C-alpha cells in the first residue's frame, strides 16, 4: 500500500487524552484497600487526642499487634515497602509486615516521623477517612497503567465494531508462539529466529491478511517515544518478509509533538500507522 497521507496533517489530529469518567481515581480499589485495614485503623483511632501517646501506643500494641501494619499508609507508603531512615546514630530499615526492630524503636519511628503529633494534637479526627484520602492520592500512580488500558479498550471497541470477535478472529495480548500455532505462520523474521519473545497487544485475521497490532498512548515526551518509533519501524521492515502478514501500530497522544522525527520515519514506511482519529473515520473498513 502506497503512503498517500500527509504526516503533519495526521500528527495534528493527535488527541490530548484517552481519559474516561473513571480514569482519574479507581475508587473501588481505594475502598477495597481501606476496607482491608478498617478494623486496625479504628483501633488506632483510640490514640487520637491521647495525653500519653507513647505509653498508650505500647499498651495498644500489646493487645493488637496488627496495628503496626497500618503505619506505613499513615505516611503514604505501602506495607510491602521497606522504610529507610538515615539517622546520625545508624541507618534504619523498617519492615512493617514482619517486625525487625524492637517495638520501642518502632515507637520512635512514629514519634520522629510525626505520626504521634498527627494523632495527639487532633490534626485528624478519623484515620479511616484520613487513609481514604491517602489512598486516593496514591492511586494517581496507577494512571500511567490506566492510560495504556484505556487506549487498548478504545482500540478493542473499534475492532469489535468492525465485526471482529474475541477468541475467533480477534486475539488480545498474544505471544508470537501462540500466533504461529493458531495461524500456522512463521514469525521468525521478527523474533530473531525465535530467540526473542514478542507479544502483541492485538492480532486480527481477515480472509487474506493477518495483522499484528501494537497499541500505545503518550501524553508526555521522553526517550521512550523515540525508542518505540525506532523499534516499530524495524518490525514494520521485518514483517515485509512474511507473506500475508502485516504490522499495524495504533498510537496517539500529544507527546508525539516533541518526538515527531522518528515517528515520521516510521510513518513513511508503515502504511498501517493509525491514531484514534483514523479509527473514528472508519480506517479499519479498508483492511483486506
Swiss-Prot record:
Pfam families given in the database record: DpnII
E.C. code: 3.1.21.4
Top-rank EC class of the record's enzyme: hydrolase
Highest taxon of source: Bacteria
One GO biological process term: DNA restriction-modification system
Protein family (similarity comment): Belongs to the DpnII type II restriction endonuclease family.
Quaternary structure, from the entry: Homodimer.
Protein name: Type II restriction enzyme DpnII
Species, as recorded: Streptococcus pneumoniae
